[in-house]
Design a protein with these regions (language model features):
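Acidic/histidine-rich catalytic cores of soluble enzymes
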Residues: 9-11, 37, 71, 124-227
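Active-site groove signature of glycoside hydrolases
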Residues: 97-114, 135, 248
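Acidic-and-aromatic substrate-binding clefts and catalytic sites of carbohydrate-active enzymes
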Residues: 12-20, 41-53, 76-86, 110-117, ...
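N-terminal pre-domain/capping segments
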Residues: 1-100, 131, 158, 266-273
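H/E-rich (His + Asp/Glu) clusters that bind or coordinate divalent metals
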Residues: 222, 226, 233, 246
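Conserved active-site loop/cleft motifs that coordinate metal ions or position small ligands
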Residues: 243-251
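Generic structural signal for well-ordered alpha-helices
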Residues: 23-30, 54-58, 91-95, 116-123, ...
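A structural motif
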Residues: 35, 100-103, 189, 242-243
Length: 273
């Protein structure tokens, strides 16, 4: 397993459109902290970005020795709005973006049963270009629960369709995120997102789930001993033979500055690998 840094770290928790730093600055921090790849989002490069600019950024990243682990090509997908599934209906520009960045994995969004058919079509188009599609474990989606996630994966029934295991969203949905969940999802896990939170009745952040209603929580650092059991997660991932990326997928947690947050998280996770 190798570490990847999501450009989300330079976004606000509630605003996923405006980056707090340039891609070049973020990449330099990632390199110095030991990350091997960036997980790209539309706040830096998306389907709205001219493809020539995307190609230039890729060349620069490659010159620094950084890969792109996965691509989220628009804003509705990370914002998890009802527009998130629209990418499945016109997957071509997203595949073009991923190809220009040298990535073979795209994150997509699904909200209802009808999206399964569109996912099949998108997967077939992606397969023609040796690319994969994956959905994150996420609130207010078809992937809130492990059991439902597996049902959807089996209905899509495409080898290039899988899941992004992400324990924090499972916690918000009241799901078990440890050994049983990881092993059940293992055959379909294309990527691993890691972020930390602590459920609290007076938490500063709010999440809306389908199966538990509104949840309040606080973002906390991974190294502070609160929230999710990351040593357990990584030990089980090792047991299952997962050898993909571990992606830091969390906005910098105040009052820790982004650079310090990125570096300390890398040090913490690297010690567990």
């Amino acid at each position: 397993m190798e570490l990847s840094l999501s450009v989300r770290v330079a976004e606000q928790l509630s605003n996923k459109r405006n980056p707090a730093m340039s891609l070049e600055t973020l990449a330099e921090i990632a390199l110095s902290a030991g990350y091997k790849a960036l997980c790209m989002r539309a706040s830096q490069l998306g389907i709205q970005t001219p493809i020539d600019e995307v190609s230039q950024k890729r060349q620069w990243l490659e010159s620094k020795g950084l890969e792109v682990s996965m691509v989220t090509g628009d804003f509705p997908i990370p914002e998890n709005t009802n527009l998130a599934p629209n990418a499945l209906k016109n997957i071509g520009p997203y595949l073009d973006l991923a190809e220009a960045l040298g990535a073979d994995l795209l994150r997509i969004g699904m909200k209802e049963e009808d999206d399964i058919n569109w996912a099949q079509r998108a997967c077939d188009e992606a397969a023609e270009r040796s690319m994969r599609l994956a959905h994150q474990c996420h609130t207010a989606s078809l992937f809130e629960k492990v059991s439902l996630s597996l049902e959807v994966i089996h209905k899509v029934n495409r080898e290039n369709f899988g899941i992004i295991y992400e324990p924090a969203n499972l916690v918000q949905c009241g799901e078990e995120y440890g050994k049983d969940a990881i092993k059940a999802l293992a055959p379909h896990t294309f990527n691993v997102y890691l972020q930390n939170l602590k459920i609290s009745t007076d938490g500063e952040s709010i999440s809306h789930t389908w199966n538990r209603g509104t949840i309040r929580f606080d973002q906390v650092t991974m190294w502070g001993g609160q929230g999710i059991d990351f040593p357990l997660i990584i030990s089980i991932l090792k047991e299952t033979g997962y050898n993909g990326y571990l992606t830091l997928h969390q906005s910098a947690t105040p009052p820790t500055p982004p650079e310090e947050f990125i570096t300390k998280t890398s040090e913490y996770l690297s010690a567990l690998l």
